[in-house]
Amino acid sequence: MRRQADRESVLPDYVKVLKPLPFNFSNFSNRQLFANFKMTDFCLLSALDLAQLVRTRQVSPLEITQYYLDRLGKYDQTVGSFAHVAWESAIADAKQKTKYLAGMGNSEPLPPFFGVPIAVKDLNCVADMPVSYGVSALKENLATYDDGVVAKMKAAGFTIVGKTVTSQLGSFPYTEPPGFLPARNPWHLDYNAGGSSGGSAAAVAAGLVPIAQGSDGGGSVRTPAACCSLVGFKPSRGRVSQAPVGDYQSGIACHGPLSRTVLEAAALLDVMEGYITGDPYWLPSPDRPFVETTGETPGQLRLAYAFSLPPFSSSSEIQGAVAKVIAVCENLGHQLEEACFDVTSLIEPFAQIWKAGVGASGIPLPLLESVNQWLGETSGTAGDYLRGVRNMQVISRQIVGFMEQYDALILPVFNHRPPKIGEWTHLSPPDVVQKIIEWIAPCPPANAAGLPAIAIPVGFDDQGLPLSVQIIGKPAADALVLALAHQMEQQLQGNQPRQLPLQFMP
């Protein structure tokens, strides 16, 4: 009881229920990697591996945290992934946890990620850390509380090493907010890391943190994951609380994990998920942890697939990635059918809600970059917003109706390569918005309908840029989507050691 009470004591007052986390992650760590483990190789281990090393007292939280802070000092100016590095508080937290370990018996239980570093997207509040929302004028704005998802990550034992850069207000699928370094793709530094969780993706892909939190309101976890050869999971609507704030975007946005493996994403989802008092919509917790069910065979499934969503088309490289996954699915015995829906009617209402989110931010428009200013200026009236919500809900019913015929849908994450750094800066705001719509059209349907969706790596194109596909599931079918993604991951990558881009290898 003392351990549970200790965990609950770190939570803000508005968090009335904390789900116990009894599952043992030692079953999911990679013992093969431990055989040749060296202290310089932490960045090649998963968050689950690191948690097991701490649990078995092979390394201390302080050693791991210092290692990652050293990598941040060495590489972050290259990739531009962090808006704020918590040099002092991260070390203080790791020292406290190391001291705590020294005073307890080896058999006493620990929170599942005790002493494992994590990064938080700079749209979320971490008490006593800056929260700028990607607005340079707010760089010194200190948060006075923890968001609900942050409180849960702290209670799970994570050490927060900083805040990752986001596109301004989370508005864009690329991360180049004025006044911050752009988030670069660690696999090809001329290209953007995607967005809006671009900093989180760049940090994980470069091995600056083992795992990170992001959020997805139109592809903002899946797009950077696809850009950076990561796993990015957008949970079902209501799976993860947005406490303590309300929701003014009609449930299109949610928190989600960015990681290098599907099992890690499932484990972080187990930490994030669950009702917090007053949530406007919520799902019951699963009977078993996602990290357990993810490793199980999903059975023979009926899958739809599409190489693009009309009215847009995708590049040959993207179509090749989808074809590769289709072949894997056929070899596994899944039933496949080419089928999709048209997203033309979704564009206008989704854009209206996007604009309204900027207008409702409360940040004066002159402090924002030109595209956000234009979005705010054209956000319309409350009636325009409500009509957009109604129309989106009508279209969402059609999307969910389509999904009732299938267990999952396989799609691209985006339609062509990501933009290079600065490639769109010379364009007018309306032209940038049109570019965005054309690029990430496969992502918003899952947000509009509240469906679970995951991006998984498939390989690389001839320019060395990552290729990816997404899997979209039925409402609340998070476990099945994760299990299918894990099955695909095993077929595509096997049990090969985790790799980093060459220049970021230890």
UniProtKB/Swiss-Prot annotation:
Superkingdom of source: Bacteria
Record-annotated membrane-spanning stretches: none
Active site per database record: 121, 196, 220
Keywords assigned: Hydrolase
Keyword NADP (UniProt): no
Presence of keyword Hydrolase: yes
Enzyme Commission identifier(s): 3.5.1.4
Catalyzed reaction equations: a monocarboxylic acid amide + H2O = a monocarboxylate + NH4(+)
Top-level enzyme category: hydrolase
Molecular function terms, GO-annotated: amidase activity
Pfam families: Amidase
Protein family (similarity comment): Belongs to the amidase family.
PANTHER family linked to this entry: GLUTAMYL-TRNA(GLN) AMIDOTRANSFERASE SUBUNIT A, MITOCHONDRIAL, TRANSAMIDASE
Record-given protein name: Putative amidase
Protein source organism: Synechocystis sp. (strain ATCC 27184 / PCC 6803 / Kazusa)
Lineage: Bacteria, Bacillati, Cyanobacteriota, Cyanophyceae, Synechococcales
